[in-house]
Amino acid sequence: MDNRPIGLLDSGFGGLSVAKKVIEKLPNESTIFIGDNAHIPYGDRTREDIINLTRRSVKFLLEKNVKLIVIACNTATAVAMPTMQKEVEQQIIGVIQSGALAAARTTKNKNVAVVATNVTVASHAYQKEIKFRDPEIKVTELAAPKLAPLVEAQKDYATNLKVVKESLAPLMGKEFDTLVLGCTHYPLIQKEFEEAINNKEVTILDPADQVAQYTFNVMRRDGLFSDSEKAVHEYYTTGNSETFDKLARTFMDDDTLTSKHVDTENY
């Protein structure tokens, strides 16, 4: 047994989509989430920037004595995770491997589309992971740099839908039956994706469920389950805590959720 918390990090709000599934899957586990909202978006930054910013959040979580870390950010998983795994003793779990596995299992016509940030698409991380599982699957990758900042800006549904439709336009007419939301921000506007795609034959895939299951499996394997009867969930942001709380309370269905501001510059 290990009663230390699970650490989760993201470039901003997006990782809440993963945190929510992890909490649902592991209700006895305490969690600490940090969103680096001050430096969003990661998807347009250099490789060096992404590694350094991810390292700061990892160090912050380690200072909080977490037992494992979930990088709840596709861009950070694609770019920084290999480096972090070399630098840190704790198990580090990313989101891309789980998303790719879910996509390979879901597609029936072996035609998958992935929408993600510029950096994630440029890394071809999803394409590599999906084809590793099934080389016959055709993977179409689409960069949508406007979408993560859109979620952070907390716009209304109509505005979101317009930008999602514009971003997905290059996919219209393609024969994919599975669309991977390759950025953890995107599930926060999944309804807009569903309306924009408007095709019941297409499965819109949020990798968070698979990430939560993999986290469960790792903890069972390594004997990391908590025997605590009451889980505690802490939220931190490098941005404005009031802005963070507004979206987080709605998405996490918790009116009492209160985050704390943290400056990771010195980590």
Swiss-Prot record:
It comes from the Bacteria. The gene is murI. Its EC number is 5.1.1.3. It comes from Lactobacillus acidophilus (strain ATCC 700396 / NCK56 / N2 / NCFM). Pathway: Cell wall biogenesis; peptidoglycan biosynthesis. Belongs to the aspartate/glutamate racemases family. Substrate binds at D10, S11, Y42, G43, N74, T75, T184, H185. GO terms for molecular function: glutamate racemase activity. The keyword Magnesium does not apply. GO terms for biological process: cell wall organization; peptidoglycan biosynthetic process; regulation of cell shape. Keywords: Cell shape, Cell wall biogenesis/degradation, Isomerase, Peptidoglycan synthesis. HAMAP family: Glu_racemase. This is Glutamate racemase. InterPro entries: Asp/Glu/hydantoin_racemase, Asp/Glu_race, Asp/Glu_racemase_AS_1, Asp/Glu_racemase_AS_2, Glu_race. The lineage of its organism: Bacteria, Bacillati, Bacillota, Bacilli, Lactobacillales.
